[in-house]
Design a protein with these regions (language model features):
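Short amphipathic recognition helices of helix-turn-helix/homeodomain-type DNA-binding modules
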Residues: 29-33, 37-68
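Residues in the helix-turn-helix
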Residues: 5, 16, 45
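Helix-turn-helix DNA-binding elements, focusing on the entry/boundary residues of the two helices
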Residues: 3, 14, 29-32
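Short basic helix-loop element that most often maps to the first helix and adjoining turn
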Residues: 1-7
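Hydrophobic protein-protein interaction segments
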Residues: 72-85, 89, 96-251
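Recognition helix of helix-turn-helix/homeodomain-like DNA-binding domains
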Residues: 10-26, 36
Length: 252
């Protein structure tokens, strides 16, 4: 966006914008908000800009527990997505809410990685997590690195930068099939392929965010949902569900 385009979008003038850039004029609270909105500045950074200019933050930052209506909405979506996995993550990819789908996916994951806050990235790629059972590990690691790098570029954050460096340092799984590329010219998206004791399951993932957040925490939450990528996965999940229900029935 050019200076002229920004000034027009913010209903200001290039002269005033130039004066703000050179320090010959002090920004008002209103003009900071207008410029920030035109530049799609995240709410957290908008608050930081206001504080730097001597103003109070415009957007509250509540805990997830305080966001009652949003939490109910997320819980509803997560539970409706059963029997497939779905979870809500914060800006550092820590899981804040989840459903109880397919515990078989997490068999063999270390107790350390299961302790709260559970980090979704570590859970999937760490050598002590699901990493050794991700059959297209290289693909999924590359996808994750791309997502984290994009996140850092849009909103630099020490926590995300550290997580990115950690993921890049993970050793590739030693199992040969974990290095296997899955080339498919007809494929529209990259699934995650996971080896389980029931067979290989493949999932496509989607990320959903709130459209009009006015709270910093809510603006940084995302719902990640996994969908079966093939009929084999649909059938395996059904088998998992039947076995789990049978186990519960025997235990009761």
């Amino acid at each position: 966006m050019t200076q002229i385009e920004l000034a027009l979008a913010a209903d200001s003038s290039t002269r005033h914008l130039s004066c703000l850039e050179t320090g010959r004029a002090e920004p008002s609270r209103e003009i900071i908000g207008r410029f920030a909105q035109c530049l799609n500045v995240p709410l957290r950074d908008q608050n930081a800009l206001l504080l730097a200019a001597g103003f109070a933050p415009a957007f509250p930052e509540r805990s997830v527990g305080e966001l009652e209506a949003a939490k109910r909405a997320m819980d509803s979506v997560l539970q409706a997505h059963l029997p497939y996995p779905a979870f809500a993550v914060d800006r550092h990819w820590n899981v804040v809410l989840s459903n109880s789908a397919i515990p078989e996916l997490y068999e063999g994951v270390s107790d350390e990685l299961r302790r709260r806050p559970i980090n979704a990235v570590r859970l999937v790629l760490h050598p002590d997590g699901m990493g050794p059972r991700i059959l297209n590990y290289a693909e999924w690691q590359a996808y994750t690195v791309q997502v984290l790098r994009s996140q850092v570029q849009k909103q630099p954050d020490a926590g995300i930068q550290a997580l990115l460096a950690e993921v890049l340092a993970y050793p590739a799984p030693t199992r040969s099939n974990c290095r296997q590329p899955f080339d498919d010219a007809q494929r529209l998206a990259t699934p995650i392929r996971i080896a389980t004791r029931f067979g290989t399951v493949s999932f496509l993932n989607t990320l959903t965010v709130f459209g009009t957040p006015s709270d910093v925490t809510l603006a940084e939450l995302a719902l990640e949902m996994l969908f079966a990528a093939d009929e084999e996965t649909v059938e395996i999940v059904k088998v998992m569900e039947r076995e789990r229900f049978a186990t519960v029935a025997v235990a009761s």
